Amino acid sequence: MTTLAKRSNKQIYRDGDKLVKVFDESFSKADVLNEALNLARIEETDINTPELLNVEKLEGGWAIITTFIEGKTLEELMEENPDKEDEYLEKFVDLQLKIFAQRAPHLNKIKDKMHSKISASKYEATVRYDLHNRLEGMKKHKKVLHGDYNPSNVIVTPEGEYYVIDWAHATQGNASADAARTYLVFTLEGKTELADKYLKLFCKKADIAMQLVQQWMPIVACSESIKNIDSEQELLDSWVNVFDFQ
């Protein structure tokens, strides 16, 4: 097997026409099976995704085995062709809107997930109370949400087909939550100009008021804070202030 990526808690390999993602012991069996189940449910939609082939216990931990998708990530293409950034961003947003048009009624609900994240966060009770109330006031939708939609999770094949990978955080609910999450990812990567360009383009194409996406930003920032990444905390703390986007 060829090693494609090594992270602190998982390793990704290519084995011929298969991709093997091996999780360490910090991932419970339930976590791994949930990610596999998410992918299986997304396979039933019209979105191009890798095909789930197997889930098995290996020496290094539980593993998810899928088809390997040949190509480059959209992030790589944007870095290699900066003059085409706007063109790629258009494709990126169009694909996100296609995801939102899908339905997968058995996915977990975004509100349930976010309530759990808020409760587990480090913030004091008054802040958590305000965040819970803000979340409860959001409109309930049933759109498919990726949960970590960014250019590194979109693969473009040599034939020009677009595949979306890594559905570990998929839920169903309000599209503005997923847009806020994408905006946050760009911002945390230091790509503030791209983040702003993305948000404006998304709101225009989706015909969604920017304020509706901004209302989710304290909530998604709180959920991200659970990871306890020191370099992110100052920015996340500033976003979690529930008065920032009133």
Model regions and ranges:
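An alpha-helical support segment within catalytic cores of ATP-dependent transferases
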Residues: 101-147, 155-158, 163, 235-243
